[in-house]
């Protein structure tokens, strides 16, 4: 039976400094653990898939045990991204590689299922409310649904229309058909993944989140909090897993 509402966390714990303001692997690992702990402890998510394309040197067995103790399943997928294109095209291409690997290798992301994709090192404070509101929806994004007026459409730093890729909901079938290969047409300089998703979503039915997701964590490119940062208690608990 296909699983519904799996959480897919895309991750890059070891990342080139040129791509991110937060590039130190130890800091990125701590932030990843902060996110995992909150997802495991504080939401109704039953299955979490963490997929990292940088093959970090870390033993995830303790956090997997923590998940089991809370009645959750944590699947960890680690691989090494193909760096030839990743290094020239940027993190958009790398993000796409991670998602493609997860869809192709996870035991929980199967046809007929649905998942919430979240950027690694982040947590959605109001996730359970969002999950309830969108239980019957197959594709939900922060922009750009067709009902949006142009003035409401999210834009990137260069003013290009885009969707947020930090957090969205997708059916596995929907994603495989419409977005799985979007990354091959991306380049951080001229066409980041947020803009490529925008173009592709214009052609297919989808909806917007009924309430704004409250994102906890720090933007890796800017080293600034989203809506809030993890608390000192979150960070202290995460360090016990290091």
Outline where the language-model segments fall.
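ER/Golgi luminal nucleotide-sugar-dependent glycosyltransferases, focusing on the catalytic module
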Residues: 1-242
């Amino acid at each position: 039976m296909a699983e519904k509402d799996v959480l897919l966390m895309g991750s890059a714990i070891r990342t080139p400094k040129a791509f991110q303001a937060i590039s130190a692997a130890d800091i990125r690992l701590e932030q990843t653990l902060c996110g995992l702990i909150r997802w495991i402890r504080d939401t109704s998510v039953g299955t979490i898939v963490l997929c990292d394309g940088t093959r970090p040197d870390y033993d995830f067995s303790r956090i997997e045990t923590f998940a089991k103790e809370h009645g959750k399943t944590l699947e960890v997928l680690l691989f090494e991204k193909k760096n030839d294109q990743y290094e020239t095209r940027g993190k958009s291409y790398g993000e796409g590689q991670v998602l493609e690997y997860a869809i192709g290798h996870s035991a929980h992301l199967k046809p007929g299922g649905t998942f919430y994709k979240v950027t690694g090192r982040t947590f959605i404070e109001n996730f359970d409310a969002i999950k309830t509101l969108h239980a019957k929806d197959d594709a939900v994004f922060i922009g750009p649904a067709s009902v949006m007026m142009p003035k409401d459409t999210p834009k990137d730093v260069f003013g290009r229309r885009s969707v947020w890729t930090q957090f969205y909901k997708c059916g596995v079938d929907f994603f495989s058909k419409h977005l799985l290969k979007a990354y091959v047409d991306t380049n951080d300089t001229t066409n980041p993944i947020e803009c490529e998703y925008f173009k592709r979503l214009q052609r297919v039915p989808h909806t917007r989140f009924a309430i704004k997701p409250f994102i906890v964590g720090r933007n890796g490119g800017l080293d600034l909090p989203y809506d809030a940062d993890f608390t000192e208690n979150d960070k202290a608990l995460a360090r016990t897993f290091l």
